[in-house]
Amino acid sequence: MRLRLIAVGSRMPRWVEEGWHEYARRLPPELALELLEIPLHTRSKNADVARLIRQEGEAMLGKVQPGERIVTLEVAGKSWSTEQLAAELERWRLDARTVNLMVGGPEGLAPEVCARSEQRWSLSPLTLPHPLVRILIGEQLYRAWTLLSGHPYHK
């Protein structure tokens, strides 16, 4: 099974890249975790933000192949405990489809992306900085995998 994080934004600080790669490399090859970055369009004072969000959404959906699962990360999504995330991860594994985790830009996800989502996941009711979200997703997926594998990381 492939897990892909499709996120709006690029040129993250080095600590973000290191944190992401640390958790991605810890996962086994049969649970490959990949990051696809969608460039964030420049938001000027007079920018048509709705149009920019639509363009970013189109670019995100352009990375998804027919039949692949889309899971959007949204504040209004469902909060999962570690055990619940582990159960979802196991369901995704058994489903054998690529799972695309979608993280929008500063204004969120395009409505077209949300409409295609099979599941909505909320990391927290708090507004989190996008660089930190990447690391949190990687760590939580790793933690869920260790729980399923009986690894002592999750205690």
Curated annotation (Swiss-Prot):
Domain of life: Bacteria
Binding annotation for S-adenosyl-L-methionine: L73, G104, L123, S124, P125, L126, T127, L128
Gene Ontology terms for molecular function: rRNA (pseudouridine-N3-)-methyltransferase activity
Compartments (UniProt record): Cytoplasm
Keyword terms, alphabetized: Cytoplasm, Methyltransferase, rRNA processing, S-adenosyl-L-methionine, Transferase
InterPro entries according to UniProt: Alpha/beta_knot_MTases (IPR029028), RlmH-like (IPR003742), tRNA_m1G_MTases_N (IPR029026)
Catalytic activity: pseudouridine(1915) in 23S rRNA + S-adenosyl-L-methionine = N(3)-methylpseudouridine(1915) in 23S rRNA + S-adenosyl-L-homocysteine + H(+)
EC number: 2.1.1.177
Matches recorded under HAMAP family: 23SrRNA_methyltr_H
Entry function: Specifically methylates the pseudouridine at position 1915 (m3Psi1915) in 23S rRNA.
NCBIfam families: PRK00103.1-4, tRNA_RlmH_YbeA
Matches recorded under PANTHER family: METHYLTRANSFERASE, RIBOSOMAL RNA LARGE SUBUNIT METHYLTRANSFERASE H
Protein name listed in UniProt: Ribosomal RNA large subunit methyltransferase H
Species: Azotobacter vinelandii (strain DJ / ATCC BAA-1303)
